[in-house]
């Protein structure tokens, strides 16, 4: 902690501002640089790979310093934000000329990973979300804000697993949490963690803040008033957003409650295994989003990814999306609309910057271009009756368009402070000041020629810099010829600089004109915001509508290009997919993809899948999940036909990985995921199980796999694909209704194997493990030895087939016995609660039947 005594006036000012912003890096404007001092300088030097120097002394100690040029700040901010750091931007707000002591400075904004709106700092095709968590006992409130669109949502989660799944879905770049949060291990993997005091989560404060933001008396109109934990989180989040932006947030105009029942639930493991927007290596190649996303606007790409991560269960909405896609294809409007939509660009984020008054001149020209496309887009939409509602959501912006066309030049400078942004003819006073300022060039050329002639100095020239203003420069070799009325202003190595009364007078006149011109231009620029902001709500609705139109047009193009079909929805539980294909694998393969059917229903709800490694079991399972998910975002699907029943959740238990950081083995991770499925799945869930029970002994693994399959088939009755190498499980269809065997085919000839990748009814005859090992390049001597050992084991197996059968019977018996014990204990507990003296004969008979039923 630095005290202010004995420091220079400038360092006192710095330390005072730093004390007000202790938890962020302070970028302190000094001339053409942003400087950092003390610990901030050391940290920035390390993170940004810039030089760490010293700035003289203050209070008797050298001051560590690092700095970046003001014109290059965006690149450095982008790097810091990506690393999860926050930065306070401290600007000079006073005039250096009239300042007594240090120029007045103040923090104008705080840039944090989750509240940035600058185009250079944002990932173009990904949402940039900030979230807040509030915990009470085992329940959580979650608030999520997209500062770049104003979308504000809350939800309430009943347990840690649900919270993890939701955080995995939204992937916040900044995460606020209460200092009272107990389960901190849930958030340790996220960057941009911010610990907040408990008082910021008070419900009464939250309600007051939200009502003030939306201009309402209560929150009933938003349907969030009963979500107490979510509101507590929202209050903290809104307060933080206001603190960092240092301005009003007019683009945040509503708040909504996200209900789990509205969406198909997908847990963190399933998102990872299905590679929706990120592959298993952490990249974006060969993901579902990479195949589906050919949107022509960044806001369309972001919306499509939201749909992928949050499939909806509202069949009416889904069928509406399907109809829109069908109409776009029938009317051949994809090629007409996409060039127009491409010109709309990222209207959503531009409007956020308009709301925050941080929009740059080129943002306004892009907004102008977007508004110019709207009449043409609406004209195309009138060709389709189904799109009337779309067209009605886009208001008439002809007044706002005319304003931007009159006010802003075609190719403005990057920043308003550079001047020359407002178009000629927009404001008469501005035009007058500019003519005075621009007349300086001609005057100075005339003066330079006149002075050369008067003095006979051919190296004489007139120049200007920000520190010394206008000057006459003469080379050192001719400086002795300077007239007596030339007053020396600056000495350089090779030249002398002078001022004369005439030039000084003109300088004051020109600087006044330039200053007045810039000041008026900034004022006019701010007035443009004043004229746009009353229409912000309509503009935001239009941008959201255009983003959705982009997604639907994109899905129509994908359906046509990739030969997708419209799936049908059924009220009957089940899936019937004819000749389904994996949407990603079919695009990556050089050879034609082998399509396969899937049939799951209430009489056929668990498929035991056997077959060789590399045979296509995992691909078959994943494609079933992806086709189902695509149907639930409203997309067409890769199949000949598809009928999809109600789905509430999609679960996967695929692949093997350990969690060394948490001290969990591969088997422990596998069992944790399996436990989650067994606790959460319902008869409307789609469950994919790939090789359960491999990480332990054979009998342990077989017992667990058997018991899990039995539970899923008999108790839960979920729609399940169950891949296994335990051939013992192929007898399950004989014992339990609803279980069926299927296998992936392969042909072996002369030690060579050909995978047919075709799904067939019945169990596989063998696993072809040695053939796959040979394909993988295992040395031939090892393969030969393995074949000999296999023959020995097969002979031994035939001799002990009775013993093997007894082991299998024992596994069944133990599981049945455990179930019988559970039933018996339930009967005993019921009997303990009965008093025979209080039962009528009829009640006693009913109890007897009930107990008999429990035992059976």
UniProtKB/Swiss-Prot annotation:
Pfam families: MutS_I, MutS_II, MutS_III, MutS_IV, MutS_V. Disulfide bonds: none annotated. It comes from the Bacteria. InterPro entries: DNA_mismatch_repair_MutS, DNA_mismatch_repair_MutS-lik_N, DNA_mismatch_repair_MutS/MSH, DNA_mismatch_repair_MutS_C, DNA_mismatch_repair_MutS_clamp, DNA_mismatch_repair_MutS_core, DNA_mismatch_repair_MutS_N, DNA_mismatch_repair_MutS_sf. SUPFAM superfamilies: DNA repair protein MutS, domain I, DNA repair protein MutS, domain II, DNA repair protein MutS, domain III, P-loop containing nucleoside triphosphate hydrolases. GO terms for molecular function: ATP binding; ATP-dependent DNA damage sensor activity; damaged DNA binding; mismatched DNA binding. One of its GO terms (cellular component) is cytosol. CDD domains: ABC_MutS1. GO terms for biological process: mismatch repair. Transmembrane segments: none annotated. ATP binds at residues 611-618. Keywords: ATP-binding, DNA damage, DNA repair, DNA-binding, Nucleotide-binding. HAMAP family: MutS. Belongs to the DNA mismatch repair MutS family. This protein is involved in the repair of mismatches in DNA. It is possible that it carries out the mismatch recognition step. This protein has a weak ATPase activity. PANTHER family: DNA MISMATCH REPAIR PROTEIN MSH1, MITOCHONDRIAL (PTHR11361:SF34), DNA MISMATCH REPAIR PROTEIN MUTS FAMILY MEMBER (PTHR11361). This is DNA mismatch repair protein MutS. The lineage of its organism: Bacteria, Pseudomonadati, Pseudomonadota, Gammaproteobacteria, Pasteurellales.
